[in-house]
Amino acid sequence: NGKQGPQVTHLPMQLLTDDAGNDSINLHLSKANPHAKGLENGKSAVAVFLGTNGYISPRWYAAKDNVPTWNYTAVHAIGTLRKIENEEELMKLVDKLTIEHEASAKSPWRADWSNSKIRKMVNAIIGFELKVERWEGKEKVGQNRSAEDQASLKRNLENSGDPAYQFLAKQMKTS
């Protein structure tokens, strides 16, 4: 939350686990991003990972007295921020993230830190480590419905032709 109210920014993130089993999430954003001004050392933060989600039509239930809804799965990482402003640490953060995302490339891109333009760009970002204190899983996939409604919903999602809806059907646990 900033002075102008709640803020949300979609960021590149990387989950890391140390030898003791502690999770942290490395992330970065532009210093010019208004959200960066409200993020500080020791502040609490939440990283949201939205999973499969989608509109659920009342037509898809066996019972006909329903309204539309939204089914979803999500995971929240809740923790404390540590600001990363040191150039060397920022370069390591970018390197780790790049290595992870370029892993499948035939000729993976690597930062040339001797290039002044690339170095200037890394100094235009601010990094953070979110030390995860707890994880929360959230899901709403029809688990509160009757077995008949769940089976009907699952069948309609599977037959939708939409890969996202078909995956949502796989997330459902039918009684």
Locate each region found by the language model.
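Short beta-strand segments
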Residues: N1-K31
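A short, structural micro-pattern
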Residues: Q7, G21, N41-G42, T69-T73, ...
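A general structural signal for short secondary-structure junctions and capping/turn motifs
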Residues: T17, K37-L39, I118-N123
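Short loop segments at secondary-structure junctions
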Residues: D18, T52, T80, E133-W135
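An N-terminal domain-start capping segment
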Residues: I25-A47, E158-P163, K170-K173
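Beta-strand secondary-structure signal
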Residues: N26, V46, I78, G127-K131
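Short, structured beta-strand-loop surface elements
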Residues: K31-L93
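C-terminal edge-of-domain segments
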Residues: R82-S175
